[in-house]
Structure formats: structure tokens, C-alpha cells
Design a protein with these regions (language model features):
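Alpha-helical transmembrane segments
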Residues: 1-12, 57
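Short, hydrophobic transmembrane alpha-helix segments
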Residues: 14-25, 38-46
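Alpha-helical transmembrane segments of multi-pass membrane proteins
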Residues: 15, 56-66, 104-108, 130-142
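Membrane-interface loop-to-helix entry segments
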Residues: 24-30, 87-107
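Interfacial helix-loop-helix junctions of multi-pass membrane proteins
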Residues: 24-25, 76-77, 91, 135-146
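Membrane-interfacial alpha-helical segments at the cytosolic side of multi-pass membrane proteins
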Residues: 35-42, 98-115, 146
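Active-site-proximal inter-transmembrane loops
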Residues: 78-94, 122-127
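Internal alpha-helical transmembrane segments of multi-pass membrane proteins
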Residues: 115-132
């Protein structure tokens, strides 16, 4: 967990130094800060697997990078855009992938370990529904703020 916190705070501090826009940075990074608080509060009672903590860290880093540059202007993806002659910077697609995949993995782990839904087909259906609802909620918040 020390490496988790070290990487988390290193990227958080880096992302807060001269971002493209501080208000946008705050909006993009606040979910990562909330996630850290939730993880800290639940760590002793319900430890997640190393895989899940790693995926959460990767998702937080994606949010922090997007907050620092804005999703449309991440330099590596500008380079990729130019090399492959694309019309736009596709970093937001990485963010959307993480927004769907990481919550699905978290929900799956919690549901399996707590034995909430025993039938695999229903469990998988619920996880997909949860992630769709969570992502839709997140998009509504983004729309409301914009």
C-alpha cells in the first residue's frame, strides 16, 4: 500500500502543478480523491485484492492526467493523433474504458466475496447494469457541471 500512496500522491501533486484550468482539474480529480477517502475508510474492514487496488490506482492516474491537460489535449495522444492521422485526441476513450472496466471489476469482487448474487448469469447481468447506471450518472454530473 505504500507504493500505492506514493504513486497516487506523486501524480496528484504533479497534476495540480499548473494544470490547463484549475476548475476543470478539480472536477476531473475529485472522483480520485473521493475514491482514496472511501478506500482508506474501508481498508481495515474489507480489503480488496491487489489487482483491484492496482486498477483503482490506474483509473485515478487516468483521471489526474485528464484533469491536468484536459482530456482533449493529453500530449501523448496528440502525438498518436498525428502519427495515425486521426481527427482528434482519443484520451477520453481511455478514460471511458477505465470508467466502465474498473467499476465492473470492483462490483464483481464485492458481489462474489460477499456472496450477494449466487447465480453467475444474474451476477454478470447485475454488474453490467451497475456499470451502465454508474457511468450514466457520471455523464449526467458532467453534463450538469458543463
Amino acid at each position: 500500500m505504500k507504493i500505492f500512496f506514493l504513486l497516487y500522491f506523486a501524480v496528484l501533486i504533479w497534476s495540480a502543478i499548473n494544470p490547463k484550468d484549475y476548475f476543470t482539474w478539480f472536477l476531473e480529480v475529485i472522483p480520485a480523491i473521493i475514491a482514496l477517502i472511501v478506500l482508506a475508510l474501508t481498508y481495515r474492514k474489507f480489503k480488496l485484492t491487489t489487482l483491484i487496488y492496482s486498477l483503482i490506482l490506474i483509473h485515478c492516474i487516468i483521471l489526474m492526467i485528464g484533469g491536468h491537460y484536459t482530456y482533449a489535449q493529453v500530449p501523448l495522444f496528440d502525438f498518436i493523433k498525428e502519427v495515425f492521422n486521426q481527427d482528434r485526441n482519443n484520451y477520453d476513450k481511455v478514460g471511458h474504458l477505465a470508467q466502465g472496466f474498473v467499476p465492473a471489476m470492483i462490483a464483481r469482487e464485492i458481489i462474489i466475496r460477499k456472496n450477494i448474487i449466487q447465480i453467475e448469469a444474474w451476477r454478470n447481468f447485475f454488474i453490467v447494469c451497475f456499470c451502465l447506471a454508474f457511468s450514466a450518472f457520471y455523464e449526467l454530473i458532467e453534463w450538469w457541471v458543463a
